[in-house]
Each structure stands twice: as C-alpha cells, then as structure tokens.
Amino acid sequence: MRCLFLFFTCCFLFHSSAQTLTLVELNCENLFDCEDDSLKQDEDWLPTAVRSWTPKRYWRKQNHIAQEILSCQEETVPDLIALVEVENDVCLRDLTKRSLLRNAGYQYLMTESPDVRGIDVALLYQPLKFRPICYDTYHIQPIEGMRPTRDILYVSGLIASDDTLHVYVVHAPSRYGGERATRPNRQLIANRLIEAIQQLPENAKVVIVGDFNDGADDPALQFLENHSLVNITRHTTGSHGAKGTYRYQGDWGSIDHVFVSSVLLDFVEQTYINDAPFLLEEDKKYGGVKPLRTYIGPRYQRGFSDHLPLVVRFRFGPI
C-alpha cells in the first residue's frame, strides 16, 4: 500500500453544518489512445484498424466523456469520478488536462492491470473535496480458463467533513463465454473485496463502485450484500426514460453499481442515472431510447458510451 504525505491547507479544512460529495461512475466504452502498445492487444484502436480510430475520433471521444461528466450535476463539477475502460495514463492526462475538463482541476489515480486489452480503472478527484491518504491496487489471480483481468483500485481519503472514505473501483470480468461459465470469475472480485474490507476499522465508511458485469440479484453481488454491504443504486433510474445504465436488445439493466457500508446509508442524499437527452438516441428496433454509443461493432456512431453515468450524492455532517 502506498501512503501519501499530504500538507493540508486551510482551504481544504473548512467546516460547516453539512458538506455534499458527488460521486459519478462511468464505463467509458473503450477510451483508447491511437498508439500501438506492443505489450497489449490494442490493435483494434489504431488509425489503420477496421474502426479507423484516428486522432480526430480520439479527441471527440475525450470531449464527449468530459461532456458526460460535466452534465451530471448543475453549478459544480462532480467531486469523485470512477472511470472504467480507460487504456492508460496518456488517456487520463489528456482527459483531465486537455479536454473540456481541463479547467476543472481534477487529479487522478489509476491501475496498471494485466488485462490483455490493456484497459484499466481510475478515480478522478477534486483535491479540495477529497484528499487521498493511501492507495493500492489489488491483483486478481486468474483461475483455470480465466484471462487476466483488471485490478481493483483502492483509495482512502479525507473529505471536507474530516471523515475518511474508503473507495474501491471495480471492473469485473465480462460474461464472454456464458454467464454461468464465467460466474466464478466475478465471484473472485467479490471475495477479494470482502477480504480487503474486513481489514478496515469497524464502522469504516466504504464505497464500492464500478462495472460488475452482473445484475443486482446475481450471486457475486448477493455475496456482497450478505456481508453487510448495501447496493444503494439497485432501483436507480433516469429522468428521460433510462431504467438502467445499459440497454441490451431492448431491455434496460444495470451492471454498474454503487455499494456502501451500512454506516454510510444515512448520508446518501440522492442517486440517479444521467440520461440527458444528448446521451440518448431512438431505439429503432425495440422502441424507446438507448445510450448513444461510440461504436456498434466496427460502425462508428459519433456517440458517447454504451453506458450511462451513475450518480450518487452524499451529504456529510449533522443528520
């Protein structure tokens, strides 16, 4: 575990009767740069590949991700952003320093996982609202027949109310190969999370966020709930027709979730899906609307992501 030596200034240690903290989770749908990494299978994301992943498309994607984040709440930017499916530090540096987010002041921590495609998870944070104390990455040892997967990112930090928040960012193994056949792969993630949380102090304020590739009632997520974690986004919807963060063959569902320890329940003020109209398109085959994604197979759609942002607002202070 890496611990950060921080010098706290008066601009961070402000106090009032209550402090809000907004968390956003977003699967970016393949935020890759345009350069070939010889150590990863990223050949689909090059200018010469079938998807024609050019610098122009890359920068449009960066600004689209920034737009999604900025549209998650009015007046101020989100305080914490858990991102899934980002390739590397280059992508995050461009997102935070050169995209439409460049003036927002975000800093970030991310994993460097053995995933064969090279995708990782990251946590963006506003330094005046969340100050990291320690961070670590938890490697998942594959079982027989399982490809190397994404590490879990762990970050503990101080928020403005002087509470310590323990944040875990997850991108669980996919269902490729069949849900039942791959179920043990996702159970590994749940097991590792519980092992980690059991090492924390009693009544620790824990947030687990990410793409679990499972629904709320699937075994791995039920395992988390059986260990005193609460899925606070189980029934979360949007205000423009989204009944989940993801739509497959006309059916809305949520494989993106936020779990918290029970001690945090009283501090949850609101949960919602950001389904702003510009993030949606008509579903001509099944009716209704669906996320306006970047690609459908190799066909470029000029969109945002195949997932919608999941938003949680906490209020810390006197209850």
Model-identified regions with their sequence ranges:
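N-terminal, active-site-proximal structural segment of metallo-dependent hydrolase catalytic domains
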Residues: 18-99, 103, 109, 113-119, ...
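Active-site environment of divalent metal-dependent phosphoester hydrolases
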Residues: 88-90, 116-118, 175-177, 213-219, ...
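Sec/Tat-exported extracytoplasmic proteins
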Residues: 32, 69-76, 82-85, 90, ...
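Bacterial Sec-dependent N-terminal signal peptides
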Residues: 1-20
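Metal-dependent phosphoester-hydrolase catalytic domains
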Residues: 195-206, 214-319
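Extracytoplasmic, non-cytosolic globular domains
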Residues: 153, 157-237
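Structured beta-strand-rich core segments of catalytic domains in phosphoester-bond hydrolases
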Residues: 28, 80, 86-166, 170-172
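Second-shell loop/turn segments in exported
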Residues: 49-56, 77-83, 110-111, 141-143, ...
